[in-house]
Amino acid sequence: VMKRKIFTLLPVAALVLLLLPCASAARDIAPIVSTDWLQANLKNPKLVILDVRRVEDYREGHIPGAVNAFYGAWAYMRDGMFASLPEKDDIDDTVGYFGIDFDSLVVVTGCMDTPRLSYQSARVACTLQYAGIKNVALLDGGMNKWVLEKKPLSCRIERRASKNFRGKYSGERFADKEYIKNNLGKLILLDTREREFFSGEKKMDCIPKTGHIPGAFNMPTSCAFNDDKTFKTKEELAQIVEAAAGNDRAAAIVTYCDIGQCCPTWAYLMTQVLGYTNVKLYAGAMQEWAQDPDAPVTKNNDASPADK
């Protein structure tokens, strides 16, 4: 077993622009794009900007040309689960409705006002990649940075010509409960919740048990961001991830959280920025896991370098 080092989160002294080549597959767009890059490319005919904020926020002002692709279209309330992965046909309909195809350059942006809102864009990006869209990017700093920099805004409700989209799905993005149960002890599990939820000191009301999946390492999603909600540098991200998950880029890894909203950020960064090739996210997360009487839960913190 690879020895994992304790990590500490270092404050960032300066804002760093993260424009990184994709580490996992050929791309025509960086996995994280700056507000300056996006402004310079607004006229690109292949560009599709997905604004995942609430419609009322979108109507108050959005990036010119952006369509309102509310987060709720990408993560359903189903069978008591707050953020279930939609069926493939539903994903196809949503992607096609927004005029996206396999040649599109898709930039996803949203509100960064709260931690959970700031994580929504990555869930949408991972779902698009699950459907076979490779050229997906996150806007560094989201709408908050765009507005702060006084870049142009539009109040026009944008509509794109829809397309008959049929996804090219693979099992590379999402894990289910049975996959984790059948591979406990073989996987590297990354619990991306804040420490007090990992340890069992706190829980969401929708989670029936406190604690975490046995053997999981705690790597909060909030650690990926600077105070201004831009992403940390590639080197800083690698330091955090390697402390918890090791540096074997081919290791089998699953990220999870409470309801499947926080964990996609690390899954996206690990595969698209840091070069990890076998990372899945568990959309059912602790909400589903803790409801299964046969799925073990522990409060033992010994497995987490962040807690030592």
Describe the role of every protein-language-model region.
Residues 2-11:
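Bacterial N-terminal signal peptides that target proteins for export
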Residues 10-21:
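Bacterial N-terminal signal peptides
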Residues 22-26:
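Sec/Tat signal peptide C-region and signal peptidase I cleavage site
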Residues 27-103, 111, 181-250:
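Positively charged, proline/Ser/Thr-rich regional signature most characteristic
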Residues 27-28, 40, 144-214, 294-308:
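Active-site neighborhoods of enzymes that stabilize oxyanions during catalysis
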Residues 67, 235, 274-306:
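Extended hydrophobic/aromatic segments used for targeting, binding, or gating
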Residues 85-179, 202, 211, 258, ...:
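Thiolate-centered catalytic microenvironments shared by cysteine-dependent enzyme domains
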Residues 233-276:
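Extracellular low-complexity, Gly/Ser/Thr-rich intrinsically disordered linkers
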